[in-house]
Amino acid sequence: MKKILLALLILPCVSCLNQTVNMETTFLKNRTFDEVWEASIKAVNDIEFTIDSIDKEAGFIGAERGRHVLGGDAPPRISIMVKEDDRNVSVDCKVLQKEQFIDVLGMGKKIVREFMIALNQNLN
């Protein structure tokens, strides 16, 4: 019985880990690509991320925050895609943790929310 209980306690600890990904998309009407692009850059800076990759033609912004979580080197990475179609502009915000970090505290969802709030503030 003790061996079964021990196995049940250890099994979750040795299971395969997936990289933590949190994503949200917002659609903005009556905004130009350039307005949303500039607001997105400001929003990334407002939430204290450092932009390390940017391509306006592709609509891509990549950034990283240099924080260490729980004594480990697992800074979150954010990827922003700004796209324009006939009627509106969309913004995809994706946050992922490097090095198979488990997002126990829900940091990824919080970062997505912070970015979306900062984006809306910069557009108003």
Language-model-derived ranges and their functions:
Residues 4-14:
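Sec-dependent N-terminal signal peptides
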Residues 16-124:
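Ser/Thr-rich, low-complexity intrinsically disordered terminal regions
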